[in-house]
Amino acid sequence: MNLETPSQENLNFMLTEITTKLKMVNVGVFENLELDSVDYNALVDIYQLIKRKSTFSPREMQLFAEELRRVRK
C-alpha cells in the first residue's frame, strides 16, 4: 500500500493498524474520521514509528495517544 498518496482508504488503514498495535481501547474516537480533518503527513510519521517497534512502554503508549489527538485539525 502506497501511503504517500493521501486517501480515505489509507487513513482508515493506518488508524486500524495503529489502534491494533497500541491495543487502544477507545477506538471510537477514530471512527468516521475524514481525510480533510487530519494532518495526513503527521499521521504517516506516527504510523511509521509505531510499525518499527515491537513493544511499547506505558509512557510511549501515552505519548503516541497524545500525538494522535494532535493530528486532528
UniProtKB/Swiss-Prot annotation:
It holds the Pfam family DUF1128. This is UPF0435 protein lmo1707. Belongs to the UPF0435 family. It comes from Listeria monocytogenes serovar 1/2a (strain ATCC BAA-679 / EGD-e).
